[in-house]
Amino acid sequence: MSNYEVAMEAAWLVRDVKETDDAIGVAVSEAGKRLNETDKQYVEVEPGVTGCPACGEPFDAAFLAANTALVGLLLEIDIFNADSEEHAERIAKSEVGGALRDVPLEIIEVIETDGDEDGDRDDE
């Protein structure tokens, strides 16, 4: 059994905003609130970034049109005692997806981590 850090991308819809910075703040806040309400405080929530297609420079993953924004969020969770990478992905999607119902999630990276930082917790 191994431990993994799983990174996911989420697409968050924010209505009635006029600026992308406001939309990003609302998205991070709402996602954090929903995770906290379901005792998932251990999930890290950050604004997502995407690369410029022309120069590759990173910029905020938010698109604003008609006072409605689609914000990309980066969610990270540590999974302990998983049988494989695929098992860690399923556990992560189940944990986060249960709290963030109706929010599209995509696994973007799975990294096997070293040993017993917090090995007594089992996220299954």
Curated annotation (Swiss-Prot):
Disulfide bonds: none annotated. InterPro entries: UPF0212. Pfam families: DUF555 (PF04475). Belongs to the UPF0212 family. This is UPF0212 protein Hlac_0869. It comes from Halorubrum lacusprofundi (strain ATCC 49239 / DSM 5036 / JCM 8891 / ACAM 34).
